[in-house]
Regions:
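Solvent-exposed, non-transmembrane regions of membrane-associated and secreted proteins
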Residues: 26-263
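N-terminal Sec-pathway targeting helices
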Residues: 4-23
């Protein structure tokens, strides 16, 4: 009985120590995630309270340019967690910002970034901006909800700004795609090529919000989503209503008007 009692006590002590070890590991993991999350949520005005004007968050551009010269914009969407800087990816390491934050430090949250093919130009005909979909709904997670029209209407416009201008973007369409299929286009030979591409995307889209106003420049916000495909992405295609548009009733008209403009 004494031997059994000692063995039981030893097992209990081991179980207690192991449980304590697991708790410590869990605390370290949670602390690490909290740290990464905090680093991935920089304030637009680090030295002052965050303020908004006409929906746009006020950004201290001088400060952020001194922190990271790759910063080119800031995006926020009212009623969501989307409120982040945007950096420009570089051709020599196009996926760098998938795992690095605005401070250039390793961070699994990354930071939203403009596709390297756009060469830092947010006015590229199809400017593609990527952001992670995190389990805590941070980063671009809320964009995956835009496939629902009611959600789009409740969370529009998308506020996007650069050091030089501010844009209230209207959502044109939302598409849920398999990232393993299809190509990516950011720049086109001419306006006709862009219109042809845009109308093709519109025809295939999961949700069409505006089928009559043909933009001449769009911004696609891209994030992972988890529904139909194994490697699924949600694309939220938006445009500045203040930028040039071609008002048409159907795709063929769009091509005709564009050809007339090019002539």
């Amino acid at each position: 009985m004494n031997k059994g009692s000692k063995a039981d006590k030893l097992h209990s002590r081991f179980a207690f120590i192991f449980a304590g070890f697991l708790v410590c590991v869990a605390v370290v993991i949670v602390a690490g995630l909290v740290y990464f999350d905090n680093q991935a949520r920089p304030s637009a005005t680090p030295n002052a309270p965050e303020t908004y004007e006409d929906g746009f968050v006020e950004v201290d551009w001088d400060y952020w340019k001194s922190v990271n010269p790759d910063i080119i914009g800031w995006v926020n969407v009212e009623g969501t967690q989307i409120n982040y800087p945007i950096v420009a990816a570089h051709a020599e390491d196009p996926n760098y910002y998938l795992k690095h934050d605005i401070y250039g430090k390793y961070n699994p949250y990354g930071v939203p970034y403009l596709d390297a093919d756009c060469e830092g130009n947010i006015d590229a005909q199809n400017a593609v901006i990527y952001g992670h979909h995190m389990n805590n709904d941070s980063m671009f997670s809320d964009f995956s909800n835009f496939k629902d029209l009611a959600y789009v209407e409740e969370h529009s416009p998308i506020y996007l700004q650069t050091p030089d201008k501010k844009m209230k973007l209207d959502v044109k369409y939302v598409d849920v795609i398999n990232a393993n299929q299809g190509g990516k286009y950011t720049n086109f030979d001419d306006l006709t090529s862009f219109v042809t591409w845009y109308q093709d995307q519109l025809d295939k889209a999961t949700l069409v919000v505006d089928k009559y106003a043909q933009p001449t420049h769009v911004i696609n916000f891209c994030t992972c989503s988890y529904g139909t495909f194994r490697n699924e992405r949600t694309l939220v295609c938006a445009a500045d209503p203040a930028s040039p548009h071609i008002l048409v009733a159907n795709p063929e008209q769009a091509k005709e008007v564009t050809n007339d403009q090019a002539a």
